[in-house]
A protein has these predicted regions:
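A broad, low-specificity signal marking well-ordered, structured residues that form hydrophobic/aromatic
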Residues: 44, 57-58, 175
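Active-site-adjacent segment of FAD-dependent monooxygenases/related oxidoreductases
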Residues: 49-52, 56
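NAD(P)+-binding Rossmann beta1-loop-alpha1 motif at the extreme N-terminus of oxidoreductases
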Residues: 1-48
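Rossmann-like NAD(P)(H) cofactor-binding subdomain of soluble oxidoreductases
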Residues: 53, 61-161
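Short, hinge-like loop/turn segments at secondary-structure boundaries
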Residues: 45-48, 115-119, 166-169
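Generic preference for hydrophobic
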Residues: 29, 59-60, 98, 177
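Conserved anion/nucleotide-ligand pocket segment
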Residues: 157, 163-178
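Nucleotide donor/acceptor-binding cores
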Residues: 1, 70, 173
């Protein structure tokens, strides 16, 4: 089974890494910039309270190089979706299933509903109906991506105020790393 995760940030990378551990799945990601370079160089690394692992996946910034997929996970923020539709279209065949999570009401929300709002398309959710046409609602599987996290470790960078002083907040931040 060919699976593409379109958007390899925190959520997309997490999903891709776990799927890559399943035998028989051909997992690829569409990423860009520093994420793409890091994935190509080091793979995807997941650290959880139960352990950590690394996974290698095919990574590209050109979706059209991947060909038609059986399953496409869209791991973009909702406002990024319209610009990504042309690239997403290159991954879709007649039997491709799409998993398009969203942080709000999805474009396909009214698809298949009866009553006064059945099949309604809301321009505010899907300007011009582009998502509806490209990612036909009958191929969509609704879901919510959710991963619990209990902490964040700063691995580098500057802290403190712009003046370079050493206020109590900065001292507290430094102590929290120990």
């Amino acid at each position: 089974m060919r699976i593409c995760i379109f958007g390899a940030g925190a959520i997309g990378g997490f999903v891709a890494a776990h799927l890559a551990r399943v035998s028989g799945l051909e997992v690829s990601v569409v990423a860009r910039g520093a994420h793409l370079a890091a994935i190509r160089e080091r793979g995807l690394r997941v650290v959880t309270p139960l352990g950590e692992f690394a996974a290698r996946v095919r990574a590209t910034d050109r979706a059209e190089d991947l060909g038609v997929q059986d399953l496409v996970f869209i791991a973009l923020k909702q406002h990024q979706l319209p610009a990504a539709l042309p690239a997403l279209a290159t991954l879709l065949g007649p039997d491709t299933t799409v998993v398009p999570p969203t942080t709000g009401i999805p474009y396909w929300y009214f698809h298949g509903l009866g009553g006064a709002h059945g099949g309604r398309q809301v321009d505010r959710l899907d300007p011009g109906g582009a998502s509806w046409r490209t990612l036909a609602p009958e191929r969509a599987v609704g879901c919510v991506y959710w991963a619990a996290s209990t902490g964040l470790r700063l691995l580098g960078g500057h802290r403190g105020d712009r003046a370079g002083s050493d206020p109590p907040r900065r001292q507290a931040a430094a102590l929290s790393d120990r």
